[in-house]
């Protein structure tokens, strides 16, 4: 069952999620839309809140999301992108700059990085796990492992805690 209109990244396997989890997925999709279509933050947030979150689109029901969480992620990523992108770049291997990643993967990493930085009240393991699950919904290859490794490295840098990975390089 496809819950995203044509032309947008679509998850492979829908997963039962809480309202924050749905907000994270919607935020990644909105950030993707902004990146690919050049849509502004106010426009995309208004579109999702009016026509997508908890609504029926093309015969498919979107799950309810926490609209404040959704707004915070999207607006936070936009506001902090010039700080987040270099941090993500540092967490990637030298031969994989952020610009080489596709728009969906960049959106997932930016949202996860922002949440690690801005939402210290949310446990690192929850953030990393949620964004790995989002990556698994869109990818079947190594991308979820990449999301796990990058967010784990960022958690070490941002929060001083990690599940084992160390930053790969410094530039």
UniProtKB/Swiss-Prot annotation:
GO BP terms in the entry: DNA-templated transcription termination; transcription antitermination
Any one annotated GO CC term: cytosol
Cited Gene3D superfamilies: NusB-like (1.10.940.10)
InterPro entries: NusB-like_sf, NusB_fam, NusB_RsmB_TIM44
GO terms, molecular function: RNA binding
UniProt keyword annotations, A-Z: RNA-binding, Transcription, Transcription antitermination, Transcription regulation
SUPFAM superfamilies from the UniProt entry: NusB-like
A Pfam family it matches: NusB
Function (record text): Involved in transcription antitermination. Required for transcription of ribosomal RNA (rRNA) genes. Binds specifically to the boxA antiterminator sequence of the ribosomal RNA (rrn) operons.
HAMAP family: NusB
Family: Belongs to the NusB family.
Name the UniProt record assigns to this protein: Transcription antitermination protein NusB
Name of the encoding gene: nusB
């Amino acid at each position: 069952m496809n819950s995203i209109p044509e032309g947008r990244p679509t998850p492979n396997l829908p997963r039962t999620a809480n309202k924050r989890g749905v907000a994270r997925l919607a935020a990644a999709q909105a950030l993707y839309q902004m990146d690919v279509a050049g849509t502004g933050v106010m426009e995309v947030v208004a579109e999702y809140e009016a026509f997508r979150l908890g609504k029926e689109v093309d015969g498919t029901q979107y799950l309810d999301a926490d609209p404040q969480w959704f707004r915070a992620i999207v607006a936070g990523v936009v506001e902090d992108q010039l700080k987040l992108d270099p941090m993500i770049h540092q967490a990637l291997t030298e031969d994989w700059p952020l610009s080489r990643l596709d728009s969906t993967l960049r959106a997932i990493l930016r949202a996860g990085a922002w949440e690690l930085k801005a939402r210290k009240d949310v446990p690192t393991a929850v953030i990393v796990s949620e964004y790995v699950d989002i990556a698994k919904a869109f990818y079947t290859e190594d991308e979820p492992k990449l999301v796990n490794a990058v967010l784990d490295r960022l958690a070490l840098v941002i929060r001083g805690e990690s599940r084992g990975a160390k930053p790969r390089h410094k530039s």
